[in-house]
Amino acid sequence: MIKQIPNLLTLLNLFFGCMAITAAMQHGAILSYDVNTGQQAIVIPEKIVFASLFIAIAAVIDFLDGFVARLFGASSELGKQLDSLSDVVSFGVAPGIIVYQFLQMAIARHDNGLDASTLWLLPAFIIPCAGAYRLGRFNIDTEQSKIFKGVPIPAAGIVIASFPLIYWYSNTTLLNNILLNEWFWYGVIFVVSYLMVCTLPMKALKFSGVNLKVLLPFIIIAAVAIVAALLVGWLAVPLAFLTYVIVSLIFK
């Protein structure tokens, strides 16, 4: 029974991924109209930020299931497959729907934007497709213990999950305007998807020693994340993600 604990945690990851999808797909979008500018927009209620919360919880559980599996010597092929299936949902599909909703809001701001083709929104689902490919490649690759090939899907999912929090809690007009620009989101889709499917070496966030050379990349990422969190709030998440990518390329 003890050896099933990691699998139960993995399924809990999947559960919160499903909760994130529910929060991101919630109905109740509001059509607004600015009488001063004549601009129309779709405003999605603030509760979409719960999708970000559920993805964050899924990420914590995703870390714990691997830790518990190693602790109890309960690693198994079943656990490996369950982990990948759960990650596709929690860090691929759920973030993809968040992007879909932001694209919908961005395009609705244009003249006749509410009548725009759904085709403009479909690129959002490149993210879960790229994540699934990355996980499939990881499952058959035996060389990704200390160094990953491409950004792991949880990191990609977390950075996308941070954008609703940035949008609703930054109180910065410039940031909000950027997040309501469809071309910004097309850029996010391209960059995040590419980073997942590429074979660039990325640091596996696992401690394998206590010497400075091993710890330095982790210290840099943690320092940037903490300082950024104090200065710019939730914007610290994409900044930490960018730091992770840069540090991985420098400390190969």
List each model region and its residues:
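Short juxtamembrane and helix-loop transition motifs at transmembrane-helix boundaries
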Residues: 1, 44-50, 75, 111-120, ...
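Topogenic membrane-insertion module of multi-pass membrane proteins
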Residues: 1-63, 240
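Structural signature of hydrophobic alpha-helical transmembrane segments
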Residues: 50-60, 115-129, 179-191
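Multi-pass membrane catalytic core of lipid/isoprenoid biosynthesis enzymes
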Residues: 45-46, 53, 71-134
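Membrane-interfacial alpha-helical segments at the cytosolic side of multi-pass membrane proteins
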Residues: 18-26, 92-102, 159-166
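C-terminal membrane-associated helical module and adjoining short loops/tails
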Residues: 145-252
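Interhelical loop and helix-boundary elements at the membrane-water interface
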Residues: 1-14, 48, 68-88, 135-155, ...
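Membrane-interface helix termini and inter-helical loops of multi-pass transporters
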Residues: 32-38, 106-113, 170-179, 204-206
